């Protein structure tokens, strides 16, 4: 299957909506959804990872001043998926601070990373991985995108 045209249209749609932030990642099937029975028709997870990273890099070129999240869906396929996204265009990464007792209620896909880590451990590991990727975490800094800041000044 070739999704190139659809994905390009998605990027152009995001630009036309004048958005300030995007969180996107590869589609990950879940057994409790109607699409589960068609999972064999999906591209391989490695291909979905490649496409997801490609979308992040293309969106960064198309919209250089928005915030783009490095999502856990990328990490579900590749343990370094979020770091790879940071290296090619993402500029936002979020720790999982949901209390452990509630995490089971938020299973968007199989193999969601960090389901057994507490908020402190999740944040610590996240900070270490961001540092390894060569990026710098901006703590205690307002996170509005430059796009948003410029838009509200008008």
Residue ranges of model-derived segments:
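Canonical radical SAM enzyme core domain
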Residues: 1-9
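Auxiliary Fe-S-binding modules of radical SAM enzymes
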Residues: 15-154
């Amino acid at each position: 299957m070739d999704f190139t045209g659809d994905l390009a249209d998605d990027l152009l749609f995001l630009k036309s909506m004048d958005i300030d932030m995007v969180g996107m990642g590869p589609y990950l099937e879940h057994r409790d959804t109607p699409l589960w029975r068609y999972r064999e028709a999906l591209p391989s997870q490695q291909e979905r990872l490649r496409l997801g990273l490609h979308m992040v890099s293309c969106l960064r070129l198309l919209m250089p001043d928005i915030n783009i999240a490095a999502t856990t869906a990328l990490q579900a396929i590749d343990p370094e998926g979020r770091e790879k996204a940071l290296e090619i265009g993402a500029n936002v990464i979020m720790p999982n601070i949901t209390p452990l007792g509630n995490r089971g209620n938020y299973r968007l896909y199989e193999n969601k990373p960090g389901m057994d880590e507490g908020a402190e451990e999740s944040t610590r590991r996240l900070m270490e991985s961001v540092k390894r990727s060569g990026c710098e975490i901006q703590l205690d800094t307002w996170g509005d995108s430059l796009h948003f800041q410029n838009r509200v000044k008008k």
